[in-house]
Design a protein with these regions (language model features):
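N-terminal beta1-alpha1 ligand-phosphate binding loop
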Residues: 2-22, 28
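Short, acidic/turn-prone active-site loops that include or flank metal/cofactor-
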Residues: 28-34
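Short, glycine/serine-rich, charged loops/turns that create anion-binding
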Residues: 11, 31, 135
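Anionic-ligand binding patches
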Residues: 2-3, 26, 41-209
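Short Asp/Glu-rich motifs
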Residues: 35-36, 178
């Protein structure tokens, strides 16, 4: 069995992978996440690949003694040397009428984002990249349509005051208090949380053994 490496510090992605019974290790990087790509699906596909490839490069540097930030046990070292691992990179964004919405810069930006989403349908895209044996073996984007109910300005301010929106794409967490404002979704709920685990699992089955 190959080792699974999650190239993300997101607690929500960790919870989702644990929820389906997978054992994995988290390794994060300081990948450059700037891109001029405007199309939502391509945007997340690209950034998920950047994150996965950055962690892959870190592991290769460990093997050549160029990076001492990651300490590997002997068993881990042998598995990495043998290419016996799969890296999962992921990136999630919200898109409204083609406008990409990432994490809010401040509370004012969070208010503007939530005001834009209120009473309308938007899309959540999560891009996923799998790397095995130095090769990208899977790179895809999953889309979910999310319909928000009307939200008053006071409700938006109260929600922002909880601090919940500030580290989330689109300034909300569907698994948190914002669930009160969701009318319906079309697609994978877990994709909105941060990772389409059902599809990820199916992809992993192709490459883990």
């Amino acid at each position: 069995m190959k080792r699974i490496i999650l190239a993300s510090g997101s607690p929500r992605r960790r919870e989702l992978l644990s929820q389906i019974g997978l054992e994995f290790t988290v390794i994060t990087s300081e990948a450059d996440e700037h891109t001029s790509i405007k199309e939502p699906a391509r945007y997340v596909e690209y950034l998920s690949s950047v994150k996965a490839e950055a962690v892959h490069d870190m592991l290769q540097n460990v093997l050549t003694d160029k990076d001492n930030d990651i300490k590997l046990s002997g068993e881990w070292y042998n598995d990495i040397m043998a290419g016996s691992y799969v890296i999962i990179g992921a990136d999630t964004i919200v898109s409204h009428k083609g406008h990409i919405l990432t994490k809010p810069k401040d509370t004012g930006n969070a208010f503007d984002i939530l005001k834009e989403l209120a009473g309308d349908c938007h899309q959540v895209y999560t891009g996923v990249t799998l790397i095995k044996n130095n090769n990208v073996v899977s790179n895809f984007a999953e889309k979910t349509d999310v319909y928000c109910n009307d939200i008053s300005d006071n409700e938006i301010r109260e929600y922002i005051s909880t601090g919940e929106p500030m580290d989330k794409a689109g300034a909300y967490g569907i698994q948190g208090r914002f669930a009160a404002f969701i009318g319906k979704i079309d697609g994978d709920y877990n994709n909105v949380v941060g990772l389409p685990v059902a599809r990820v699992y199916q992809e992993l089955k192709l490459w883990l053994n």
